[in-house]
């Protein structure tokens, strides 16, 4: 047993546990075990019943507002289990400060995080706050609505229907994001060469409508990952990476990121993959497992997501990850998803079908490159079988046309066909 983000051990009762009560209440909840040392060894408490009363009094006297918690006395080993639920009346303060968990530590939140807790406690999202700039134009939004859903009139009633404007506060931040010109960040796209030291081209789209940002990102994608093959009198469009998958990834980055930080969505384009990193981790109330399973039931920017949905840029809310996985169902190398506290990263690999490779052949395939010849010495040490089997599998993969062999003897090298 060890400490985690939602589990803390306290061998004795000191006021430091109150910071953790604040942290658990402000976010996803958690458990504190009293009478257990830092290594998870049960020590017990001298007077567990009195300790239970002391813990209750300390919480009631020190945390505001009152957190939702439950105390359980474990008579068998004289320990106490304190279960703290995520609260609704955020922020929960200890000595006028709010706390959060950082891995297994408890730290004070910064000014930005504190303001987010205040909004969360009032059930207000950043996109709903009044926009700083109230002189906004919406030519791009108007054009897209007329093209995609055939609306005839675009006026303030349209903006009210989309929850972008109200008579009391004017335009909100969601409206600002969709306006032709704004003060918000956007997307920074970099096309790399053989390594990250070689930048072939950089494109940054910011301070314009997120609809324009979305379209510009697609244009850059098409330049690098789509091409035409002439077959007789016909031209056939080919894709190295699925445009549908890229669309989903970019749309998800735009509608699920945090917009109260001045950070760009970063798109790194390589010959064999694309990486999309969006600022902000998962919204409160969603676990990484739920996100990866496509169960994104909590929307950080509901109004913005609604516009993207109406325009047909996304399908059902929260299904982007599932859709991307489906598009790669027959691919040899699958997309990868990474979630951290402050960012979400999606990696879309070059789409290549699994041409009946065995599991061992797939292991080797993933170590080879489409652009660089590799000798067996750069493959064999990284596979879970011997050099002779590796050589045999490479020969079979060559016969299948999956890889190409160049050179002879010790100079033999391999490259993906």
Protein language model features and the residues they cover:
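Short amphipathic alpha-helical interface segments
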Residues: 356-385
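Intrinsically disordered, low-complexity regulatory tails
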Residues: 66-133, 260-264, 315-318, 330-339, ...
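ATP phosphate-binding glycine-rich loop and adjacent ATP-lid/helix-beta elements
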Residues: 288-332
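Residue-level detection of the helix-turn-helix DNA-binding "recognition helix"
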Residues: 395-399, 407-408
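Short, cationic-aromatic polyanion-contact patches
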Residues: 351, 357-360, 405-417
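Polybasic/polar functional segments that serve as interface/processing modules
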Residues: 1-32, 36-83, 88-90, 95-98
